[in-house]
Amino acid sequence: MRNFDIIKDIDGLETIHRYCAIAEDFQATNPMISVQQARLALETMVKTVYRLKGWQIGERASLLSLTADERFTAFVNSEDLMKRIHYVRKIGNNAAHANDGFVGRRESFFAVLNLYYIVGSIMLAWQVIDTLPDFDKELVPQSAKTSTLTVVPQPDQAQAATTQSADALAQAVGESSDAQPATVEAQPVVNDLSEAETRKLYIDLLLHEAGWTVTEQVGKIVPRQAGIEIEVQGMPNESGMGYADYVLFDADVTPLAVVEAKRTSVDAVAGRHQAELYADCLAARYVCPRPVIYYTNGFETNIIDGIGYPSRKVMGFHTIDELRRMIAQRGRADITDLQISDRITNRNYQKRMIESVCKHYNSKHRRALLVMATGTGKTRVSISLVDVLVRNNWVKNVLFLADRIELVNQAKRNYAKLLPNMTVSSLRDSDVDISARILFSTYQTMIGHLDKDAKTFSLGRFDLIIIDEAHRSVFGKYGAIFEYFDGLLLGLTATPRDEVDRSTYDLFGMEQGEPTDSYEYDEAVADGYLKPFRAIKDNSKILTEGIDPDQLTPEEREQLDEIFEYEKMKAGLEPGDPYSRIINATEIFKYIYNHDTVDYVLNRLMNDGIRVKDDTLIGKTIIFAYNHKHAVLIAERFAVLYPDLGPDFCRVIDDKEKYSSDLIDKFADVERLPQIAVSVDMLDTGIDVPEIVNLVFFKPIHSKIKFWQMIGRGTRLCENLFGEGKD
């Protein structure tokens, strides 16, 4: 009998039961195998939830990105259960790469215990099991002789089968469930942790991630290590003595930080004043700056850094070098050297933006949000701000995040050109320099680094994190990045401030509609920094009303019959069976592809679009297509209609093209082809080509935010576009 036998005989749960059973059977005899299998069980469980919920799982999705997604956290609906999920994930990561003996029987027991309540709570939610018994420690084998499992899948082999297993599990669980639960009801964990157990499990894991070795001997002080139960003198009690749960010591045994831990059932804030007293006593005893203060209950950790910021929540602990820098920053002055380089930003509104952010940071705010219309120089403003912050000794290391590699590369080029004295690198570079002062990354790549077995970045690695196009979808999918890194935050968005959603303002600690500063489209047009757009509305009846077979010409009906024959075959009907239906407008170019409509749109573009070079050449154009198949059809029809313009005049640029970055570079060059880019999402945002003068919206746009981003592709100023002196 084992604890995980509660799911042993349930059809479809064989794989997850095996992972769980191995984790339980090897908990005492081989902790490394135990926690690895626990992590695999967790990943299978999470992917099963995604498939049951109908949520898409990205090809490169990591366990961190899946569990940090706001849909999943809302489903789990319990901070306690989420902490247990992340413990199993993290301890499994540690075991996969560490041979330092950190993972022992205590760690594996806690992983198995947490896994039991994670799986049990989710199975209860889907009514796969009726009750969840308390975890029975006595059922866990304490020797190899009592283990019933001898064959252990290798982690890499098991990992490869996880997705396939999750699909099978999702089907089985889905069939056995009466309804889709909105949320999980977390089950109470009977093994309430003592303060010491909290320290050895949650907190020790976080310290280990930050590179700290925890001494085993109470009261022992070792250079560059975390001492436990360190005696302090001068406390306001009868004996004048106290014992700090942890003290993090520098190489010369100067205390850099003190950690006060309370039971997991106690609010972390309960330890704040006690930690402050310990810090004061240590500063007096060692005649040193007051140590950085952490107070935690294992689930939640807060920091008082001594720089002047209010206490704040952090996701772990800082490294020894980060603590040294933090203490050194206490003497820094406000940002007063506001000398802004005209070489980088020479417009008054850009300088105002930089000054607004600096004033905001001087006021002890850690997060700033700028709303700037596309084409007004968001990236340049961020570069100038970095220049100012570095010069004022506020920032040393910077992380720039964007949602596509093309935008990352574009930003990297601009930073390298305008800040030549700072090292830059992209995490997507083959020769990436992890130690570069300014690192560039997509959100997806960074999430992958945070969920690696060996953690690439500590939480204090970056002093400033810049978010390109800060909006709700980014925070919903990749919020774990901004929760993890403990640095100043700068959000950039082209979304009009009244359209920015409340959750984005909440993330930056701001009132609705009140960003740090803004410079919007109408203002930029009035000032002459952007050009107004002229809309030509042209709807096809097919695109707005769909296709009614009874309203077609004989020739059109013949084309539609070919589609109906295909549908009959899929439906298992005989070729001669009668079949007809009305095609909805939403199916056009998603399923039904109409040549006549494509030809009409292309001819309209070539006849009415803005032309350059003395009106002899259609200007740079983006056609926004429904999907890849639609984009290919557009390019093919263009080649048929205008063969004299050559094969490269109109090209598809989307994520199906392996070397899309090269095509974008050619499109951005006024002297090179393509002249027309047919895009599926890739050119909707971020691409900086001032020569673009025509935008064809060949798909419905339901988001105002996305619409304004797309409009911004064609509103930039471009000198001499129509000839010398004609901008």
Predicted regions and their residues:
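Conserved C-terminal RecA-like helicase domain
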Residues: 437, 567-573, 578-679
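Amphipathic alpha-helical interface elements
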Residues: 1-156
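SF2 helicase catalytic motif II
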Residues: 455-491
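Conserved RecA-like P-loop NTPase helicase motor core
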Residues: 291, 464, 650-727
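ATP-dependent helicase/translocase motor core
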Residues: 120-397, 406-421, 435-438, 444, ...
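Interdomain helical connector at the RecA1-RecA2 junction of SF1/SF2 helicase-like NTPases
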Residues: 502-618
